[in-house]
Amino acid sequence: MKKQKGFTLIELLVVIAIIGLLSTLAVVALNNARMKARDARRVTDVKQMQTALELYYNDAGKYPASVATGSTTSGTCLSTSSTTPEASGFTAVCNPGGVIYMAMVPFSPTPVDAGCATSTDYAYTRDDDNGTTYTINYCLGAAVGEIPKGSRRATPAGIR
């Protein structure tokens, strides 16, 4: 009797099942890596905003005014104006002739991570009329170093 060449149905099913399992594990690991990368970027963005705000504070003697209620600072410019001081702070377009501290406040990376609101853009608020303190609200899908996941805030005292 001649021996047939090839694989049996059972052998093929076992190989397909193993490939499927390995693919699933790779996708899960990749999604976790992407979430960690987005969160690391969020922390870096907030630190850059804090640096720009401190430079602004050193020059102006106070932090810039809050943006409109319900708005975010993402996509705006942080600058001063030499001709119209009231136009200093977060504006839609950088003021020509002024000092630019941050040409464009970054947008939070997408997609939104679990446990965060539908909009996770960075929201800046000056906490008092004297301009001595502020809050930047942001959200993390997972802990980054010592910073726990969830809704977080940054102030002149640091990131929490």
Q: Language-model segments: what does each one mean?
A:
Residues M1-K2, G141:
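Conserved beta-strand elements of beta-rich interaction domains across eukaryotes
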Residues K2-L30, R34:
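N-terminal single-pass transmembrane signal-anchor helix
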Residues V27-K47:
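Aliphatic-rich helix starts adjacent to a transmembrane/signal segment
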Residues E54-Y138:
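Extracellular/periplasmic head regions of type IV pilus-like filament subunits
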Residues D128-R160:
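Short, surface-exposed interaction loops/tails
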